[in-house]
């Protein structure tokens, strides 16, 4: 029998924004942030937890912003998908330097750069002890990487989708604007919808609700938060079917 606390989850889908890789710098990717991410993921990996990651591309491009600048929205979304692949390559490099076995599976195949996404292949890699990074969203325009996270989480039978943000969880209001905003520790899907709380993209959120996929929202910038959310029910905000 294994002594000591055990992880709450066996297989997780971690959703990270592209902006998380910027840190506080002016560059799209901060190498120090990559090193910290690799350290955090290694801590969880060493517990025997299977880890899959969906990474955004907002540190390079956002389709909506490019549309406002005059670029066709569909074209802008494809540019954003390629940005997620650049981020995936950066993460893979950092993980490999930390001796983590890792594979990139892309919804847009790119021979010599990343393998094409295949559900069975993804599950096989996880079962073989490899970290899997999903790139290029769902491969479809007009679909957010939040939706890619909910979809991939359901496809790989993850125990939970971990939504990494820059705040400690889901609040009653924007904590940056309202210091009196309340941090929720536990919400049902219906409560979050009724209160119009910004948990994630609405389509992605409803998909998680419909397929009973729990969500944990937490602060990726908080030291040790990823490990804590795996081990501790109190870290971040849990959103599920409720009682």
Swiss-Prot record:
EC top class, as a word: transferase
Keyword list (alphabetical) reads:
ATP-binding, Cytoplasm, Kinase, Nucleotide-binding, Pyrimidine biosynthesis, Transferase
Query: Per its UniProt entry, which superkingdom is the organism in?
Result: Bacteria
- Part of which pathway? Pyrimidine metabolism; CTP biosynthesis via de novo pathway; UDP from UMP (UMPK route): step 1/1
Q: Is tRNA processing set as a keyword in this record? A: no
Which NCBIfam families does the record cross-reference, listed alphabetically?
pyrH_bact
**What is the protein name given in its UniProt record?**
Uridylate kinase
Say which species the protein is native to.
Answer: Coxiella burnetii (strain RSA 493 / Nine Mile phase I)
- Upper taxonomic lineage: Bacteria, Pseudomonadati, Pseudomonadota, Gammaproteobacteria, Legionellales
């Amino acid at each position: 029998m294994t002594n000591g606390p055990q992880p709450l989850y066996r297989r997780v889908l971690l959703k990270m924004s592209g902006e998380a890789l910027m840190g506080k710098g002016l560059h799209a990717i901060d190498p120090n942030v990559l090193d910290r991410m690799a350290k955090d993921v290694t801590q969880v990996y060493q517990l025997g937890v299977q880890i899959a990651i969906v990474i955004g591309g907002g540190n390079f491009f956002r389709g909506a912003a490019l549309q406002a600048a005059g670029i066709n929205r569909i074209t802008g979304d494809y540019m954003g998908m390629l940005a997620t692949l650049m981020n995936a390559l950066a993460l893979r490099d950092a993980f490999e330097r930390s001796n983590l076995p890792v594979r990139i599976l892309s919804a847009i195949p790119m021979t010599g750069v990343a393998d094409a996404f295949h559900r069975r292949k993804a599950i096989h890699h996880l079962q073989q002890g490899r970290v899997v990074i999903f790139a290029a969203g769902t491969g479809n325009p007009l679909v957010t990487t939040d939706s890619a996270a909910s979809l991939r989480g359901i496809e790989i039978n993850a125990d939970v989708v971990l939504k990494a943000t820059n705040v400690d969880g889901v609040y009653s209001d924007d904590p940056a604007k309202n210091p009196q905003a309340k941090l929720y520790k536990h919400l049902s899907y219906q409560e979050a919808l009724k209160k119009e709380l910004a948990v994630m993209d609405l389509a992605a959120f409803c998909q998680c609700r419909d397929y009973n996929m729990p969500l944990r929202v937490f602060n990726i910038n908080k030291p040790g938060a990823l490990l804590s959310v795996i081990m501790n029910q109190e870290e971040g905000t849990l959103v599920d079917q409720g009682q």
